[in-house]
A protein has these predicted regions:
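Active-site proximal loop and beta-alpha junction motif in alpha/beta enzyme cores
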Residues: 1-4, 9-224
């Protein structure tokens, strides 16, 4: 896997608790992890003198690839026609280090009732596969401008549903920011994930846009 958010968060958290384990590599309160996708900046987060989490900066610029038909998404999550919104963006392959198909659903009920159809995922992987990755899907619903509710399914990678997917949340935050016409702005999103499987997580994503280009993408997870 070229990049994954939470392993970076966890490794950054643990190493920040024991900086003596990495002499010479811990300076100015930042670490740099070298990974297949590129260099990942990891910034420890503190409450007083206690490490409570990590911020990580996505290794790649946000990119969008091909679109995927609504019907394929509907089959994968066993929902009805009309459940997928395309007014902002059609279902699209996007990423900041690891690619996912990202699709917006009409309401919270559709999000909550989505069920992973592994056969449909296998069919989608045959028809709409991208790169060397299996077909993985993030669906989301906009609660409001800042609170986003999401679910991630990756059954072909052995994960029927993931409780927290930093790489997908980073891509989602960048996708949402790219839909805004402001040339210069900073966007902050709170992405709620894992609630339907009893493992709720909150991933904070911030994106800086300058001259209509996404310049910086950071996501933060508190361990405690």
């Amino acid at each position: 896997m070229p990049f994954a958010g939470h392993p970076n968060v966890g490794a950054g958290f643990l190493l920040s608790c024991f900086p003596n384990l990495i002499p010479g590599n811990y300076s100015k309160n930042k670490m740099v992890f070298e990974e297949i996708a590129g260099l990942v900046n990891v910034i420890p987060q503190y409450n007083g003198a206690t490490v409570v989490g990590s911020k990580i900066e996505a290794p790649n610029k946000f990119h969008k690839l091909e679109t995927v038909p609504k019907s394929a998404i509907q089959n994968c999550i066993e929902t009805n026609e009309g459940s997928i919104i395309t007014s902002n963006d059609p279902p699209v392959v996007a990423g900041v280090g690891l690619d996912f198909v990202i699709a917006e659903v009409q309401n919270q009920e559709i999000l909550n009732n989505a069920r992973c159809n592994i056969s449909a995922f296998s069919e989608a992987d045959k028809n709409f596969s991208y790169g060397d990755d299996f077909f993985s899907l993030m669906i989301y619903y906009r609660g409001n401008q800042q609170n986003i509710f999401a679910r991630v399914f990756a059954p072909l990678s052995g994960i029927v549903e993931d409780a927290a997917t930093g790489s997908a949340c980073g891509a989602l935050g960048a996708l949402l920011a790219s839909q805004n016409n402001d040339r210069n702005n900073k966007y902050n999103y709170k992405i709620h994930q894992g609630e339907m499987i009893g493992r709720p997580s909150l991933i904070n994503v911030s994106i800086l846009k300058e001259k209509a280009k996404l310049k910086e993408l950071i996501f933060q997870v508190n361990v405690f």
